[in-house]
A protein has these predicted regions:
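Short amphipathic alpha-helical segments
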Residues: 34-59, 94-103
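Glycine-rich beta-strand-turn "strand-cap" elements at beta-sheet edges
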Residues: 1-24, 61-71, 98-121
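Intrinsically disordered, low-complexity N-terminal regions enriched in serine/proline/glycine
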Residues: 39, 49, 71-73, 113
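Short, well-ordered beta-strand segments in beta-rich or mixed alpha/beta enzyme
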Residues: 23-31, 61-92
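Residue-level signal for secondary-structure boundary sites
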Residues: 36-38, 84-86, 119
Length: 121
């Protein structure tokens, strides 16, 4: 069951418990019903154009689960220079327009902001 309407605040990441310094990563998991992948991907691609043009944007990747049984079949991973850049991009009227455009109500998501704690290669 999906809501009849997803408001801009439904796409907003909760505030940090502390002031973050350095790069941050948004991980946003989406529920996409089987057979709706193409519609989701097209909507995501239109929305991505807004974010890639914002100051502080580093990169954006969209992942699809290899199992059709996954609860969240698509995951968006976006890297930003700082939390301040991320918040600025997510605080505009254009952001609110982009994330409430028709179609998004079909794809509920669970966005959260992260920082790298340990990295190995």
């Amino acid at each position: 069951m999906t809501p009849d309407h997803i408001a801009a605040q439904d796409r907003v990441v909760p505030a940090s418990d502390r002031v973050l310094t350095g790069p941050v990563t948004l991980m946003n998991s989406f529920k996409v019903s089987p057979g709706r992948d193409e519609a989701f991907h097209e909507l995501w691609a239109r929305t991505a154009k807004y974010f890639t043009a914002q100051p502080g944007f580093i990169s954006l990747r969209l992942h699809r689960a290899v199992s059709a049984d996954a609860q969240y079949r698509w995951v968006n991973v976006a890297n930003w220079e700082s939390e301040a850049h991320f918040r600025a991009a997510h605080g505009t009227d254009e952001f609110r327009r982009v994330v409430t455009q028709p179609g998004w109500e079909e794809f509920p998501s669970s966005p959260m902001l992260y920082q790298v704690i340990t990295e190995t290669s």
